[in-house]
């Protein structure tokens, strides 16, 4: 009681926050924005789900404090999409293990583990069920650095399969990026191909802020999303969009599964179409977007979501 009373008196005696500091400590103030391109001598072509597996494998070897857990991620199953297959055998049940079927528990325990110095990389089996962990994400994960004035951090990675095109119906096809892009303090990656997925996930595993890593399950094994595999040194910083193809008549801004659909839609239009793959939704690469619009003066935003109020809106 004496300690609590003393802490309360100390808090009461502190000056009011400076309004000029209101935007500080949402994220770590410094971030490595240097970009590394895939080497010319990249390896064999791999599909997106295998690039996720390889990125996790390399980062587990890189950081002995990294742990992976979620529903059915351990053992021979390696998750419903096999993204973690083989990692339990390689790193042991103490570092790759199954969790209860409880998203709030998965995310809540990750907050605690991160506070102890671990690097939790958790899998939410389907984005459609992440809502059970919404309180933890909104009020704990995304705000940890801000509400502690930079003294604490919550550097967890939440891997979340999202999107349609797998006959998953209403409970296995949801697009959730618009909801989470609204939250300050949460980075969001959304790759469209295997090389970007590997580079972004490896970078996410080394960042000091919380990451929501969205993986479109309709792209996991598609040939058009496969890429020559970058080596273990490839890190792709957040906030660096990719010019998929250059053009002068109109700009298409897109991400995830709609990148390939935009390429196909533009093919026979007779127009010179520039296509931008955002790669990450937060941070958003406004520099690349504005540079393109200065050239084309026209824009189409192509995104997979409900009709109203998606991230593209």
Predicted regions and their residues:
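Intrinsic-disorder/low-complexity detector
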Residues: 1-30, 34
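Generic alpha-helical secondary structure signal
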Residues: 2-5, 17-21, 50, 174, ...
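Thiamine diphosphate
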Residues: 1-13, 23-214, 218-219, ...
